[in-house]
Amino acid sequence: MNNGFSTGEEDSRGHADQTCCLIDDMERCRNQAGYASYSKRIQKTVAQKRLRLSSDPSAQHIYICDHHKERIQSVRTKRRRKDSEDDSNETDTDLHEFPDLYQLSVSTLRRYKRHFKVQTRQGMKRAQLADTIMKHFKTIPIKEKEIITFFVYMVKMGTNKLDQKNGIGNDTT
């Protein structure tokens, strides 16, 4: 399962003869169906985002084409990032790029949660945990000028604490 879409790797049926099961703006899509399925969860997302997509009741399957899969995923990721930025107290969020925490494993997210003592409820799914951690991550204050100044200083001096720990900066020549 990838972002709510079934990848179909566990499905042995072929999709070469099937077309997308969606009706896009009152017209049935004629693209070849891929391995992504139009699940109840995806239907809910489509309804919330007010996309003009619906499943064709005459379709014998729930597989959708890659075009619609990408369209649904792009709306989902845009919304997630927009919500996260709205919750932030920063005035200029366009200048900041944030890591994609949604790609991290659950154990890594839990380790972050433990380290920063982020309060969450028990049994959260990975996406919910990533949302909570992203909101916390954006609240961590950083002093960009100080960090850049320190970085330039370290480069000019030719020293880096991380390189020395790993044995990289210890040249004996």
UniProtKB/Swiss-Prot annotation:
GO biological process: regulation of DNA-templated transcription; regulation of G2/M transition of mitotic cell cycle
GO molecular function annotation: DNA binding; transcription coregulator activity; zinc ion binding
Modified residues (Phosphoserine): 84, 88
Zn finger (Atypical) location: 20-68
Region (Disordered): 73-94
Keyword annotations: DNA-binding, Metal-binding, Nucleus, Phosphoprotein, Repressor, Transcription, Transcription regulation, Zinc, Zinc-finger
One of the record's GO cellular component terms: histone deacetylase complex
InterPro entries to which the protein is assigned, alphabetical: His_deAcase_SAP30/SAP30L, SAP30_C_sf, SAP30_Sin3-bd, SAP30_zn-finger
Modified residues (Phosphothreonine): 91, 93
Subcellular location: Nucleus
Protein family membership: Belongs to the SAP30 family.
Quaternary organization: Component of the class 1 Sin3A-histone deacetylase (HDAC1/Rpd3) complex (HDAC). Not essential for stability of the complex, recruitment of the complex to some promoters, or the deacetylase activity of the complex.
Protein function: Component of the class 1 Sin3A-histone deacetylase (HDAC1/Rpd3) complex (HDAC). Appears to be a non-essential subunit of this complex which is not required for cell cycle regulation of progression through the G2 phase of the cell cycle.
Protein name as annotated: Histone deacetylase complex subunit SAP30 homolog
Phylogenetic placement of the source organism: Eukaryota, Metazoa, Ecdysozoa, Arthropoda, Hexapoda
Gene that specifies this protein: Sap30
